[in-house]
Amino acid sequence: GFHTINSGKLTSYNNAKFIPCTPEGCFEILKYYNIEYVGKHVVMVGGSKVVGLPMALQMLHKESTITICHKLTENIQNITRLADILIVACGVPHLVKKDWVKEGVVIIDVGINSIPDASKKRGYRLVGDVDTDDVYEKVKYITPVPGGVGPVTIAMLIKHSVENL
C-alpha cells in the first residue's frame, strides 16, 4: 500500500496493486452491511496518507461525491451534517457529536484514542473520534471503537500478505 509506485497508482482508477489496509477494511465493512456508496455524499474527516487520502481517492473512483475536512476545518459540523456516510480518522477523542450528523447517517469511526479512566486497571480506555453514546440515536450504522475497523484492517493485512506470496 505505501510503496511510492503503489501510492502514485492510487490516484489513477484501478491501477493500485493494493489499497492500504484500513481504507480497504472500511470498504469491506460497507460491503458486508450492503451499504451503498455510489452516488452518495461521503465526508472524510482526516487527510492522512494512511487513511484519509487513500479512502477519499477510492471513494471518488467508486463514484461517490467526496468532501475532505480536517479537525480544524471552520464550521466543520455544517459539512459533516451533509454526509450520507461519515468517515472519521483524525485522532481527536469524541470530536463528532450528535449535532454534527444528520438522521440516518452511516459512520465509520477509524479513530483510536486512549483517554484517562480511573475505573480501568490500566488507567485508560480506548475511544473513537466519534462520541458514540451521543450520536447513537441518529445513526443508521456506526462502527465501534475498539473492535470495529481495527480487526478488519488486520484481516486486510493478512489478505495482502497471502496475495503477495
Feature locations, PLM:
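Rossmann-fold NAD(P)-binding glycine/threonine-rich loop
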Residues: 2-10, 108-165
